[in-house]
A protein has these predicted regions:
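Beta1/beta-strand and adjacent pyrophosphate-binding region of the FAD-binding site
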Residues: 41-52
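Glycine-rich FAD pyrophosphate-binding loop
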Residues: 45-47, 58-81
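Predominantly flavin-linked oxidoreductase catalytic cores and closely associated redox partners
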Residues: 59-62, 144-293, 325-326
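FAD/FMN-dependent oxidoreductases across multiple families
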Residues: 159, 271-349, 353-354
């Protein structure tokens, strides 16, 4: 569910896509003998094997002075996710086309009153939005990290013993985890000492809790994978759909995204999480005959962070991906930012380690990884936050949003912003014209829209994770 309302952010977004260095030299597996600077050998634990963890582990594994251990409880896990990835990720992270189920070149936006706008006419023939199944993409990234030398542990990290003086170079972290053998549901309690930890274990991050990273507000994303007939699947060959309206979500959107041989149908909300199944029923009804008669083959639900964690580095523990809160508002995009943050964190830490002669401090990690990431993408998160508040707040604004997407200028900068994580060719005159169109569309939208249904859940809305 990753690219929906990047639309108007394009005119003001300041984030630019700047590929980071990606080491490719193969490394030999050398047994760890000490974590001292004299032996130039350290152990890094990457907790989580999704895109953020796998991309971090891949960088660490290519360093001869680092032993890399990657923990993942469910190696075949299919995380609830729309599965959209931008074109720049395919190239930057060397994603093979075999992991891309569908190449979406057209997006239908459907307003609360049923007005449809198709976007995608500005795309070049070789441009597309990739649709992936997370179980396929994640496995590919994990396997690549393992090929470079990362040790994969099928285990669940339950807690971390953090020494009182953990900001000093001679202190080590003890990971307590359950290790699972193949075919067993019972985990064997185990421990491991490491010099540095990267928390890539998702929105419900145990690493974040152990390091007292603070809480954040969250959305619930709910998705059903529905197998439909080949005839109906043909409609979604290169097509995705986005539905807006308070019937499908009071603050987000509903989607129908094509997968390999089925569609993902889902929605999400922050402000009314208890009603998520009601909203899911509504998105199925609005999709109507296009998915009628389909068989639900999988039901998925998962929390999605709404903003950064208050603390993302503590001592030599750093958070990346969903654990850090790197999911954009409006679009709910997280895969690219997970992979990017994992890589950026690992590259910064590797550089700070100076060929195994130095363990980085909290201040050093914050002044490199955190500063660089926020400098690149902070403006994008801010703008999309504002846009979500403006265009997802009520049905009148949602009607205006869909109508605005008729603009070829909006479509052009939308796809430039999403596909390449940069804005190309913004024209001040066109931006000024867009402002006028926005005001006009809002006036018209409020005139035709039906009132939003009222709801109240003051206790649930205060919950944080």
């Amino acid at each position: 569910m990753k690219f929906a309302l990047a639309t108007l952010a394009c005119a003001t977004s300041a984030a630019a896509f700047q590929p980071t260095t990606f080491l490719r030299a193969p490394v030999a597996n050398v047994a760890a003998d000490s974590s001292s600077a004299l032996s130039m050998r350290y152990k890094v634990a990457v907790v989580g094997g999704g895109p953020s963890g796998a991309c971090a582990a891949e960088i660490f594994a290519q360093e001869k002075n680092i032993d890399t251990v990657m923990f993942e409880r469910k190696m075949d896990n299919a995380k609830p996710c729309g599965g959209a990835i931008p074109l720049c990720m395919v190239g930057e992270f060397d994603i093979p086309e075999s992991t891309v189920d569908r190449k979406v070149r057209q997006m239908n936006l459907i307003s609360p009153t049923g007005v449809e706008v198709s976007i995608g006419s500005t795309l070049k023939p070789d441009e597309y939005i990739g649709m992936c199944r997370r179980e396929i993409l994640d496995k590919y990234l994990r396997d690549r990290a393992i090929e470079y030398g990362a040790e994969a542990v099928n285990g669940l990290v339950t807690s971390i013993d953090i020494p009182q003086n953990h900001k000093t170079s001679d202190a080590r972290y003890t990971l307590n985890y359950l290790e699972y053998s193949e075919g067993s549901n019972a985990g064997k309690p185990s421990t491991m000492e490491v010099d540095l930890v990267v928390g890539a274990d998702g929105a419900n991050s145990r690493v974040a809790k152990c390091m007292d990273a603070g809480q954040y507000n969250f959305a619930i994303a709910f998705q059903e994978r529905i197998k439909i007939s080949e005839e109906k699947m043909a409609f979604y060959e290169e097509m995705a759909e986005m539905y807006v309206g308070d019937d499908v979500s009071p603050d987000f959107y509903g989607w129908v995204f094509p997968k390999y041989d089925h569609v993902g149908v889902g929605t999400g909300t922050v402000v009314n999480r208890p009603a998520i199944k009601q909203y899911q029923k509504a998105i199925r009804e609005r999709a109507g005959d296009k998915i009628a008669g389909g068989k639900i083959i999988k039901v998925e639900a998962h929390p999605i962070p709404e903003h950064y964690r208050p603390r993302r580095v503590q001592g030599r523990i750093a958070l990346v991906g969903d654990a850090a809160g790197y999911v954009t508002k409006c679009s709910g995009e997280g895969i690219y930012f997970a992979a990017k943050s994992g890589r950026m964190a690992a590259e910064a830490i590797v550089k700070l380690m100076k060929n195994g002669t130095h363990l980085p401090t909290q201040a050093e990690i914050e002044s490199t990884y955190i500063k660089d990431y926020d400098g690149l993408y902070g403006p994008t998160y801010l703008v999309l936050d504002v846009l979500q508040k403006v265009f997802y707040s009520n049905n009148g604004a949602r009607e205006a949003f869909v109508e605005l997407c008729n603009s070829k200028y909006v479509q052009q900068v939308t796809f430039d912003s999403y596909l390449y994580k940069k804005v190309q060719g913004n024209n001040p005159l066109d931006d000024l014209k867009l402002l006028g169109e926005t005001i006009g569309c809002l006036v018209k939208g409020y005139a035709v829209a039906k009132p939003d249904q009222e709801f109240s859940n003051p206790v649930e809305s205060q919950k944080r994770i």
